[in-house]
UniProtKB/Swiss-Prot annotation:
EC supergroup of this enzyme: translocase
Name this protein carries in UniProt: V-type proton ATPase catalytic subunit A
Localization, UniProt: Cytoplasm; Cytoplasm, Cytosol; Cytoplasmic vesicle, Secretory vesicle; Cytoplasmic vesicle, Clathrin-coated vesicle membrane
Protein species of origin: Pongo abelii
Family statement drawn from the similarity comment of this UniProt entry: Belongs to the ATPase alpha/beta chains family.
Activity regulation statement: ATP hydrolysis occurs at the interface between the nucleotide-binding domains of subunits A and B. ATP hydrolysis triggers a conformational change in the subunits D and F, which induces a shift of subunit d. The c-ring is subsequently rotated and results in a continuous proton translocation across the membrane.
Enzyme Commission code: 7.1.2.2
GO molecular function: ATP binding; ATP hydrolysis activity; proton-transporting ATPase activity, rotational mechanism
Length: 617
């Protein structure tokens, strides 16, 4: 929001409007003489005018969580009420920007103050008022038209990837008395004027929305389109949908951040909101360094990924209270782009730090602690955040659909999934990508454990797969069966060794090894494997399962005859085929293209069939 427009303590004439600081405990300040204040109202605390939010009211005492460092605040300092809730500014200029937890633009603050830290009580507007945007009004809108909340009345080309649709705020309606002609305007210029019941109201390209309030929609729709991540293990075995909720719990060093970053780089979303909530500052600087260099191809043109990304950075050394706000800021920005009809992905890295901030503030308020010291309302807060995801029919005209998908990373201490934050999250989300420390230690990345992870969207996506990839669903079932069987056989192998297994079991073990090492494992730092399109995923899986079926059939049909085929014979004769199977992943989708990869995989299938025929003869 525009902090420069909030009232200042020096401008206030009457001292009776002030409250006064009564006590300070870290980020929590108590103030007296605050009768008439509202819950979640923004206040300015002390002579440095720190931004704070009221989180508890008792008589004329208010408890305030302050979003800045409170050293130097003393008892008796004035507290000024602003009469507004914590809100964000929504308008052109969000994409490619980096904000802190309460939507202060970090690059603007850095250029204005020449400091590497955010000074206290800094006043800047979230969206720059100096940049001119090229505004084009909608063709069918003229003076005298009636418009209502959510209607799109103009378009601004924010950059070559995002067409920013300018919408009427949800609660307004009326008859158009003025609409700006096409031209360049900044975000403080009036572009629309409405009249409703004799009252005229002017609108700029920016709307302000309270972060704790859900933006209204016409209706929620069932989600039925996959969120493709480019990671084979996730797309094939545990798919998520556009508008779904996902949790990625894992201990330190398991690759949570790499998965959430590759989601933001390569997923099929239109807009990415990346919230770094209480994680290391280096990770956010890595995102800032990598993303501008990363490109994607749109309609034959190469574009920077940063053009569709907004970052909310709230690293672990920033004030604790702002961590809680950063999650709400991120989800409100996501909902705004969803209302334009875009598919938005929001990455929250990590929700555990957010829960720890809740725990710290709850402890300072002397509330009753529940499990592990977290507050009793932890589950409710998590649910109210995750439930803002979904695929919806947007408010207003023209009719459009949008979605918000939330991917929350959870870092349980010591990788223990029975931790309260993880268990509360798993009760809410529909997809669980559990990361395994043992796999990470074996350098098997992405370290998603295929035995404990699950997705509840399988049924919802069956229709999509039947339409576009008919053979995929049985392949996935078969692959999961092979991996499960391999897990059961692993114990027997440890006891009696491989040699004493049945031939079919040996095949299961070898194919499971092939699937694990050459299908599920993926090197995110190579050009050919950093992103795997879905046709390549299906092609690879179908050849591996075809090999498994043919090998089993060859062994089973010749089991009774004299020249029976065993696994060792297959391996001897088919060294070349096995090598080709394990090197399917080296096909580069950008260099080779879809048609060549598909024909190569079809050729490999033909070679396999011929090899098994000659073996049986």
């Amino acid at each position: 929001m525009d902090f420069s427009k909030l009232p200042k303590i020096l401008d206030e004439d009457k001292e009776s409007t002030f409250g006064y600081v009564h006590g300070v405990s870290g980020p929590v300040v108590t103030a007296c003489d605050m009768a008439g204040a509202a819950m979640y109202e923004l206040v300015r605390v002390g002579h440095s005018e720190l931004v704070g939010e009221i989180i508890r009211l008792e008589g004329d005492m208010a408890t305030i969580q302050v979003y800045e460092e409170t050293s130097g605040v003393s008892v008796g300092d004035p507290v000024l009420r602003t009469g507004k809730p914590l809100s964000v500014e929504l308008g052109p200029g969000i994409m490619g920007a980096i904000f802190d937890g309460i939507q202060r633009p970090l690059s603007d603050i850095s250029s204005q103050t020449q400091s590497i830290y955010i000074p206290r009580g800094v006043n800047v507007s979230a969206l720059s008022r100096d940049i001119k945007w090229d505004f084009t009004p909608c063709k069918n809108l003229r003076v005298g038209s009636h418009i209502t909340g959510g209607d799109i009345y103009g378009i601004v080309s924010e950059n070559s990837l995002i067409k920013h649709k300018i919408m009427l705020p949800p609660r307004n309606r009326g008859t158009v008395t003025y609409i700006a002609p096409p031209g360049n305007y900044d975000t403080s210029d009036v572009v629309l004027e409405l009249e409703f019941e004799g009252v005229k109201e002017k609108f700029t390209m920016v709307q302000v929305w309270p972060v704790r309030q859900v933006r209204p929609v016409t209706e929620k729709l069932p989600a039925n389109h996959p969120l493709l991540t480019g990671q084979r293990v996730l797309d094939a075995l545990f798919p998520c949908v556009q508008g779904g909720t996902t949790a990625i719990p894992g201990a330190f060093g398991c690759g949570k951040t790499v998965i959430s970053q590759s989601l933001s780089k390569y997923s099929n979303s239109d807009v990415i909101i990346y919230v770094g909530c209480g994680e290391r500052g280096n990770e956010m600087s890595e995102v800032l360094r990598d993303f501008p260099e990363l490109t994607m191809e749109v309609d034959g043109k190469v574009e920077s990924i940063m053009k569709r990304t907004a970052l909310v950075a709230n690293t672990s050394n920033m004030p604790v209270a702002a961590r809680e706000a950063s999650i709400y800021t991120g989800i409100t920005l996501s909902e705004y782009f969803r209302d334009m009809g875009y598919h938005v992905s929001m990455m929250a890295d990590s929700t555990s730090r957010w829960a720890e901030a809740l725990r710290e503030i709850s402890g300072r308020l002397a509330e009753m602690p529940a499990d592990s010291g977290y507050p009793a309302y932890l589950g409710a807060r998590l649910a109210s955040f995750y439930e803002r995801a979904g695929r919806v029919k947007c408010l207003g005209n023209p009719e459009r659909e949008g979605s918000v998908s939330i991917v929350g990373a959870v870092s349980p201490p010591g990788g223990d999934f029975s931790d309260p934050v993880t268990s509360a999250t798993l009760g809410i989300v529909q997809v669980f990508w559990g990361l395994d420390k043992k796999l990470a230690q074996r350098k098997h990345f992405p370290s998603v454990n295929w035995l404990i992870s699950y997705s509840k969207y399988m049924r919802a996506l069956d229709e999509y797969y039947d339409k576009h990839f008919t053979e995929f669903v049985p392949l996935r079932t078969k692959a999961k069966e092979i991996l499960q069987e391999e897990e059961d056989l692993a114990e027997i192998v440890q006891l009696v060794g491989k040699a004493s297994l049945a031939e079919t079991d040996k095949i299961t073990l070898e194919v499971a090894k092939l699937i694990k090492d050459d299908f599920l494992q993926q090197n995110g730092y190579t050009p050919y494997d950093k992103f795997c399109p879905f046709y390549k995923t299906v092609g690879m899986l179908s050849n591996m399962i075809a090999f498994y079926d043919m090998a089993r059939r060859a062994v089973e049909t010749t089991a009774q005859s004299d020249n029976k085929i065993t696994w060792s014979i297959i391996r001897e004769h088919m060294g070349d085929i096995l090598y080709k199977l394990s090197s399917m992943k080296f096909k580069d989708p950008l260099k080779d293209g879809e048609a060549k990869i598909k024909s190569d995989y079809a050729q490999l299938l033909e070679d396999m069939q011929n090899a098994f025929r000659s073996l049986e003869d």
